[in-house]
Protein backbone atom coordinates (compact mmCIF):
# COMPACT_ATOMS: atom_id res chain seq x y z
CA UNK A 1 0.00 0.00 0.00
CA UNK A 2 1.26 3.49 -0.88
CA UNK A 3 2.45 5.59 2.02
CA UNK A 4 3.00 9.35 1.73
CA UNK A 5 6.53 10.61 2.16
CA UNK A 6 7.56 12.18 5.43
CA UNK A 7 6.73 15.87 5.39
CA UNK A 8 8.84 18.67 6.78
CA UNK A 9 7.98 20.12 10.14
CA UNK A 10 5.54 22.99 10.62
CA UNK A 11 8.32 25.17 12.01
CA UNK A 12 10.27 24.86 8.76
CA UNK A 13 7.13 25.70 6.79
CA UNK A 14 6.44 28.72 9.00
CA UNK A 15 10.03 29.87 8.60
CA UNK A 16 9.77 29.74 4.80
CA UNK A 17 6.46 31.59 4.89
CA UNK A 18 7.95 34.27 7.14
CA UNK A 19 10.82 34.84 4.70
CA UNK A 20 8.43 35.05 1.77
CA UNK A 21 6.08 37.42 3.60
CA UNK A 22 9.02 39.57 4.69
CA UNK A 23 10.23 39.96 1.11
CA UNK A 24 6.68 40.74 -0.02
CA UNK A 25 6.31 43.39 2.70
CA UNK A 26 9.56 45.08 1.64
CA UNK A 27 8.48 45.09 -2.02
CA UNK A 28 5.08 46.51 -1.08
CA UNK A 29 6.68 49.26 1.03
CA UNK A 30 8.98 50.23 -1.85
CA UNK A 31 6.01 50.34 -4.25
CA UNK A 32 3.99 52.55 -1.88
CA UNK A 33 6.95 54.88 -1.39
CA UNK A 34 7.55 55.13 -5.12
CA UNK A 35 3.88 55.79 -5.79
CA UNK A 36 3.77 58.56 -3.19
CA UNK A 37 6.86 60.25 -4.59
CA UNK A 38 5.45 60.12 -8.13
CA UNK A 39 2.11 61.56 -7.03
CA UNK A 40 3.70 64.41 -5.06
CA UNK A 41 6.13 65.21 -7.86
CA UNK A 42 9.23 64.52 -5.78
CA UNK A 43 10.38 61.60 -7.93
CA UNK A 44 13.67 62.46 -9.63
CA UNK A 45 14.33 59.11 -11.28
CA UNK A 46 11.71 59.52 -13.98
CA UNK A 47 11.68 61.51 -17.18
CA UNK A 48 8.24 62.29 -18.51
CA UNK A 49 7.78 63.33 -22.14
CA UNK A 50 6.30 66.80 -22.40
CA UNK A 51 3.52 66.97 -24.94
CA UNK A 52 3.59 70.18 -26.89
CA UNK A 53 0.27 71.62 -27.98
CA UNK A 54 -0.16 72.08 -31.69
CA UNK A 55 -0.91 75.65 -32.73
CA UNK A 56 -3.13 76.22 -35.72
Swiss-Prot record:
GO terms for molecular function: structural constituent of ribosome. Keywords: Ribonucleoprotein, Ribosomal protein. Transmembrane segments: none annotated. Pfam families: Ribosomal_L32p. Coiled coil: none annotated. One of its GO terms (biological process) is translation. Disulfide bonds: none annotated. One of its GO terms (cellular component) is large ribosomal subunit. It comes from the Bacteria. PANTHER family: 50S RIBOSOMAL PROTEIN L32, CHLOROPLASTIC, LARGE RIBOSOMAL SUBUNIT PROTEIN BL32C. Belongs to the bacterial ribosomal protein bL32 family. This is Large ribosomal subunit protein bL32. It comes from Prochlorococcus marinus (strain MIT 9301). The gene is rpmF.
Amino acid sequence: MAVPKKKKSKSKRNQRHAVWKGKAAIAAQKAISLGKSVLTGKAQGFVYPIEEEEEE
